A protein has these predicted regions:
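Bacterial N-terminal signal peptides that target proteins for export
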Residues: 2-10
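Intrinsic disorder/low-complexity signature
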Residues: 4, 16-17, 394
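C-terminal, well-structured catalytic/ligand-binding subdomain of enzymes
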Residues: 27-78, 82-84, 89, 93-121, ...
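Intrinsically disordered, low-complexity linker/loop segments enriched in Gly/Pro
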Residues: 110-144
Length: 412
């Protein structure tokens, strides 16, 4: 058994005291290597939460070293909301709201982050995670769709409640005919027409269907197109069409049930490996903060736990890039308290003059991606070079925030 029952139960009591609930919508996907343009499996989590300050942490005190996204106020890093480990195992989740049976009176809840941290610490494969779910004492204190990939091509969802789970193997053509599955905030095994995120699911499904028609699914599609999609599948609206003329033309629109939301705190894609590659080439493409006001930073596991400082908590406990992304987010959402999360100023985000916040920061991201892909190509052909990872992170710290500030003329 992965963890003795008495210790697990004691840990639950501690977490119930400290827990920050994930109880808001998320949009997620698991993609088999069979459906990707390079044969590497992918995880996507567009994270929605009440805790908008997120940071990245390196863990090294268990069986496997790993990198994970945590809530900034979680000072002891009890919960991880998406991540990967040195064995090439990656995990994320979306909260579900239709999986519990009507007779489930369990009091403990919202332990998904605890379970995922435990999995990253102990699991190397999809099968390891399944065994962990079986062995852990019940009730688990969860209601979630867990998505996992591993270094052997494994890719699956586990729709999990307090006592049971159902596995969806994304490599099985009978389950995932196109090689991918999507989950928002309901489970396919749960109560019909219950839960949340049906519109977001339809939007994401449309994006994936169009992408697979044109070819294979890439990590770029997952990290660029999905979390930043301004299409609303129910109203047939696309905010990226017919843009306002100028940043001065205030153009507030109702902003609910899009994939990016006011409550979106991060978007992360874990890109796995081919079976002949080192698990250390697993890459976590990470956007801290609102995806339309932040940039993607790639992460790899360094032996000494090095990470970009702009993604780690500083003396305030917050990650500098997340702070900046939230500052820029304030420029595009309504300043009126009772309308704040419901209305977005499209002209401040994008306009025909290309002076919107998103339009100004994209060149910074493009520079990062160009540098990262060049490094990855080299490492995949000749092996990972530890010192080059550290140099890349140093370059990120030296340039990214400075370049964003320069583009937007923000004074430090």
């Amino acid at each position: 058994m992965y963890i003795k029952k008495k210790y697990f139960q004691a840990f639950l009591v501690l977490i119930l005291i400290l827990n920050h609930s994930e109880g808001l919508p998320c949009t997620t996907a698991v993609v088999s290597g069979k459906a990707t343009n390079d044969g590497r499996p992918l995880l996507l989590k567009n994270r929605d939460t009440g805790e908008l300050q997120n940071r990245i942490v390196f863990f090294s005190d268990g069986k496997y070293r790993f990198i994970g996204l945590v809530n900034s106020p979680d000072k002891n890093n009890h919960e991880v909301w998406v991540g990967f480990n040195e064995a090439g195992f990656g995990i994320m989740n979306s909260a579900s709201y239709n999986l519990k049976s009507s007779d489930d009176t369990t009091k403990i809840s919202d332990l998904e982050g605890v379970i995922m941290k435990m999995a990253l610490d102990k699991c190397a494969t999809v099968d390891d995670f399944e065994k962990m779910l079986e062995d852990l004492p019940k009730p688990l204190g969860v209601e979630a769709n867990f998505g996992v990939i591993d270094a052997y091509g494994g890719a699956a969802y586990f729709e999990t409640n307090n006592f049971d789970y159902i596995k969806y193997d994304v490599n099985d053509p009978d389950i995932a005919p196109e090689g991918y599955l999507i989950r928002t905030n309901y489970s396919f095994a749960g109560k019909e027409n219950k839960g949340y995120g049906y519109i977001r699911y339809a939007t994401a499904a449309g994006l994936f269907e169009n992408q697979i028609k044109d070819g294979k699914i890439s990590f770029e599609f997952l990290i660029n197109d999905v979390p930043r999609c301004l299409v609303h599948s129910f109203t047939n609206t696309d905010l990226a069409e017919n843009l306002p003329e100028s940043v001065n033309d205030k153009d507030y629109v109702y902003f609910r049930d899009y994939i990016p939301r006011y409550s979106t705190s991060a978007a992360v894609v874990v890109q796995g490996i081919k079976e002949d590659e080192s698990p250390l080439l697993t890459t976590m493409w990470t956007i801290l903060g609102f995806p339309l006001t932040s940039v993607t930073i790639p992460l790899w596991l360094a032996d000494d736990g090095s990470l970009p400082a702009i993604l780690m908590g500083n003396e305030s406990g917050n990650a500098p890039l997340c702070d900046l992304a939230l500052q820029l987010k304030d420029k595009v959402f309504s300043s009126q308290n009772d309308a704040r999360e419901n209305y977005i100023n499209v002209s401040a985000l994008m306009n025909k003059e290309n002076t919107g916040v998103y339009q100004k920061i994209i060149p910074v991201e493009e520079q990062i991606m160009k540098h990262a892909l060049k490094s990855l190509d080299k490492w995949r052909s000749s092996g990972l070079v530890e010192n080059e990872i550290k140099k890349f992170y140093q370059w990120i710290d030296a340039t990214v925030i400075e370049n964003i500030n320069s583009k937007l003329k923000i004074e430090n």
